[in-house]
């Protein structure tokens, strides 16, 4: 599924889902919430083939994000220095993004269900949706091993990411993007990221990381049974209880918290993405979005969430509600005085854990080159 670019006068992403079964429909919706369309100059090749880099110094790779109901394939390039990617040299381009069943692809040992195009050397991170399937017993470690062993193209890192892995990689990618956007040193950047099954927090530097279970599909099912108001209370109570187990003191020294993925989607609809905002400003804006999405009517209509695929308005509204409430819970849990920057992309670089994995691969390549 490819999403159309939003109108020029609309800053939020075009996002959508298709109707099939109820559960599959929501997985597609989760994937759509996960996306923000980023424009990449059409004159470039797989990443950039006309940027003037000396070819011997170029490092290229692709990263597959296999998570909750989606597969996103991004290709990256940078210039290597002695430590990895040289500051400011990373470029990225999303090659594909689609509704996909990563669990089925793994069981079938069939990468083509997730990746349909040639790539530079490929790294794969399997995230919350796959972790949940393994925890339920729907997928076993030997299934994953067979899937990885079946891949015929050149590869680098192939891994089921733990929640802590995902949080650390988000911190690495978010630190790079925060420096690119605002000049903030990466060691002073905390991060918050989210998907369909989990959300992650990482304090700056070598601070604590945490991954929390936030099942959007499950809460949508309960909302259909109990109504939005009761489900929203349950959702907030569960998230707040998990957040109380996180030591947020490590964020007190953060110059900035870089908020990515579905948190950035919520901020885009609330009008606080792409700029530095104080905690109170973000909280008020997200509170307004939660209120607007709490019921059909003029307030919700005024949000103007794009719907190019003519989706069921009620489920679109409900998904927005729970995603915004989740983001607001995290914002409220972090220390007063925290500065946030919500974004999926800085310039032409996608900012998420996939970037962090590419940066790690580049650092390993630089170390190999110097040894």
Spans of model-derived segments:
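Short, low-complexity, Lys/Arg-enriched N-terminal segments of secretory-pathway carbohydrate enzymes
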Residues: 1-20
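Ser/Thr/Pro/Gly-rich low-complexity linker/stalk segments immediately outside membranes or between
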Residues: 39-57
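Short loop/turn segments immediately following beta-strands, especially the blade-tip
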Residues: 78-85, 206
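Short loop/turn segments at strand-loop or loop-helix junctions that form parts
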Residues: 66-67, 93-100, 122-129, 260-261
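Helical "lid/coupling" subdomains associated with nucleotide-phosphate turnover
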Residues: 61, 75, 100-118, 129-191, ...
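Hydrophobic membrane-insertion alpha-helices, especially the h-region
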Residues: 22-37
């Amino acid at each position: 599924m490819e999403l159309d670019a939003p109108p020029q006068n609309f800053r939020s992403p075009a996002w959508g889902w298709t109707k099939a079964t109820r559960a599959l429909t929501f997985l597609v919706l989760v994937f759509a919430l996960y996306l923000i369309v980023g424009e990449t100059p059409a004159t470039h090749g797989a990443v950039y083939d006309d940027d003037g880099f000396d070819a011997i110094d170029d490092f290229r790779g692709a990263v597959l994000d296999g998570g909750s109901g989606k597969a996103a394939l991004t290709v990256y390039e940078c210039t290597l220095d002695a430590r990895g990617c040289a500051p400011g040299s990373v470029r990225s381009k999303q090659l594909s993004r689609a509704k996909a069943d990563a669990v089925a692809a793994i069981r079938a040992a069939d990468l083509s269900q997730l990746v349909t195009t040639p790539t530079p050397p490929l790294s794969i991170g399997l995230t919350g949706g796959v972790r949940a399937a393994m925890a339920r017993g729907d997928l076993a470690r030997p299934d994953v091993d067979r899937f990885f062993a079946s891949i015929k193209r050149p590869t680098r890192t192939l891994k089921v990411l733990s929640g802590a892995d995902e949080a650390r990689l988000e911190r690495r990618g978010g630190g790079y993007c925060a420096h690119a956007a605002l000049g903030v040193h990466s060691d002073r950047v905390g991060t918050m990221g989210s998907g369909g099954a989990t959300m992650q927090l990482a304090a700056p530097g070598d601070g604590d990381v945490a991954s929390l279970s936030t099942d959007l599909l499950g809460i949508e099912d309960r909302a259909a049974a109990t109504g939005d108001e009761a489900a929203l209370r349950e959702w907030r109570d569960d998230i707040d209880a998990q957040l109380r187990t996180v030591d947020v003191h490590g964020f007190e020294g953060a110059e900035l918290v870089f908020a990515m993925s579905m948190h950035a989607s919520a901020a885009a609809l609330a009008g606080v993405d792409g700029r530095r905002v104080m905690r109170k400003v973000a909280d008020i804006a997200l509170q307004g979005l939660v209120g607007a999405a709490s019921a059909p009517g003029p307030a919700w209509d005024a949000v103007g969430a794009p719907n190019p695929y003519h989706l069921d308005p009620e489920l679109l509204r409900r998904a927005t509600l729970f995603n915004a409430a989740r983001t607001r819970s995290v914002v409220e849990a972090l220390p007063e005085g925290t500065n946030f920057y919500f974004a999926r992309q800085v310039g032409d670089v996608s900012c998420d854990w996939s970037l962090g994995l590419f940066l790690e691969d580049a650092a390993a390549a630089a170390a190999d080159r110097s040894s």
